[in-house]
Amino acid sequence: MGRARRFQWPLLLLWAAAAGPGTGQEVQTENVTVAEGGVAEITCRLHQYDGSIVVIQNPARQTLFFNGTRALKDERFQLEEFSPRRVRIRLSDARLEDEGGYFCQLYTEDTHHQIATLTVLVAPENPVVEVREQAVEGGEVELSCLVPRSRPAAVLRWYRDRKELKGVSSGQENGKVWSVASTVRFRVDRKDDGGIVICEAQNQALPSGHSKQTQYVLDVQYSPTARIHASQAVVREGDTLVLTCAVTGNPRPNQIRWNRGNESLPERAEAVGETLTLPGLVSADNGTYTCEAANKHGHARALYVLVVYDPGAVVEAQTSVPYAIVGGILALLVFLIICVLVGMVWCSVRQKGSYLTHEASGLDEQGEAREAFLNGGDGHKRKEEFFI
């Protein structure tokens, strides 16, 4: 009897040790990642919950909810679910200062707690693109792209004409966020004026496949060009002619000058900006007219030779010159085609003649052989006598 009492307490302790872990309450959490300004859900999963006190605290150890009752007056935190299986809270408009570990505490005979780590990412805003100095044709342009806030550090890329450009990037950490910059250099010409260069920023805070872009329109300065267009190709006495000086340049020339060689313009002429109007033309108006334009990068000059014909004169318009060129090209093509056809016919005739010659030669040899076979060697002798 005494021996039985001796083993009673050890058996009870062994049963408690085996049964305790299997019947105890537990709490589990999961880490959460959210973009700045987004919505995060923090969940505490309960196992074998028996109605004990559940407390949720923020990273500063301030109590947010006590058994489903709000304890901190921050309306961004809302209790979404409180059940024997889980406690779920919702955080809207997430901020960097909300980042950290959120405590899920279960108060029983032994306090249990787990930490859910909230990570807040910062998506980049549209990059800021600037040019270091004014671009001029024949030189280089340097562009810079800046993203002042991002987390993690944004990756910057340059694109031009759907091709990626190689830039040089640098970053600086400011507290929890990064400031990232990138520069790119390339040569430019006047044809690049108005072209588009894109700076693109990406990081994990943006949805997959999304990016923030800024388009920069190139401003390339270059010297002017000038060309005169006439309102008609052939002018006669009494006609009105309008000459237009088509000017390009960056910056665009703001003044155009009209001249007529070493002579002054006719008194009837009206020069207004890019146009020169010559009404009531006479032969005395003949001459070389010029328009000139300039900017800080150079100047341009265009010429137009005016010939005024009599009213009854028969002349060919200047626009007929392109047709003459086209006609000459067509004539040359026809000549080449004829040459090719003649060559093909000549080769065909020559090949056929060679075939007939060989065929006739073969017939002679066969006839001679047949005659020799029939007459024995007489044929050979007769040939000798014939030749003698």
From Swiss-Prot:
InterPro entries: CD80_C2-set, Ig-like_dom, Ig-like_dom_sf, Ig-like_fold, Ig_sub, Ig_sub2, Ig_V-set, Neurexin-like. Residues 1-20 form the signal peptide. PROSITE patterns: IG_LIKE. It is found in: Membrane. Residues 124-219, 224-307 form the Ig-like C2-type domain. The chain crosses the membrane at residues 325-345. Glycans are attached at N31, N67, N286. Residues 25-324 are extracellular. It holds the Pfam family C2-set_2. Involved in the cell-cell adhesion. Has calcium- and magnesium-independent cell-cell adhesion activity. May have tumor-suppressor activity. Belongs to the nectin family. This is Cell adhesion molecule 4. The lineage of its organism: Eukaryota, Metazoa, Chordata, Craniata, Vertebrata.
